[in-house]
């Protein structure tokens, strides 16, 4: 198995556990140049809030979308949008990525923004 397959396998296990709980989840996806976050309802069929470094208003604030600073901006933004949608508590789905660097920065910024994990 290569690195990507291992990550996806890890992600599948995590998502299965979160699906059993039927809780709202905050899922993160990252590439070398961008980071994306979505708040998805318990059934997994509806996106309640989304934020990413691809958006024009976020891109105008940042010189680079693939660093910790960008992840913090996206974390604060997703927390604001989730609270506006009526979501206070989420399960954190890191999609198999290590809880380190940009993923950790996004999670901490979302917590500071008022989301409970």
From Swiss-Prot:
Entry's family note: Belongs to the universal ribosomal protein uL18 family.
Entry's Gene Ontology molecular function annotations: 5S rRNA binding; structural constituent of ribosome
Record key words, sorted: Ribonucleoprotein, Ribosomal protein, RNA-binding, rRNA-binding
Name of protein: Large ribosomal subunit protein uL18
Assembly information from the UniProt record: Part of the 50S ribosomal subunit; part of the 5S rRNA/L5/L18/L25 subcomplex. Contacts the 5S and 23S rRNAs.
Purpose of the protein: This is one of the proteins that bind and probably mediate the attachment of the 5S RNA into the large ribosomal subunit, where it forms part of the central protuberance.
One Gene Ontology cellular component: cytosolic large ribosomal subunit
Superkingdom assignment: Bacteria
Annotated source species: Aromatoleum aromaticum (strain DSM 19018 / LMG 30748 / EbN1) (Azoarcus sp. (strain EbN1))
């Amino acid at each position: 198995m290569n690195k990507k397959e291992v990550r996806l396998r890890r992600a599948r296990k995590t998502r299965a556990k979160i699906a059993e709980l039927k809780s709202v989840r905050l899922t993160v996806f990252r590439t070398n140049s961008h980071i994306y976050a979505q708040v998805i309802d318990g059934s997994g069929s509806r996106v309640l809030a989304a934020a990413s470094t691809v958006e024009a208003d976020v891109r105008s604030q940042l010189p680079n979308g693939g660093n910790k600073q960008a992840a913090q901006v996206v974390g604060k933004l997703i927390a604001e949008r989730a609270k506006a949608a009526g979501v206070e508590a989420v399960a954190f789905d890191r999609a198999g990525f290590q809880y380190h660097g940009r993923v950790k920065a996004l999670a901490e910024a979302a917590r500071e923004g008022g989301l409970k994990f």
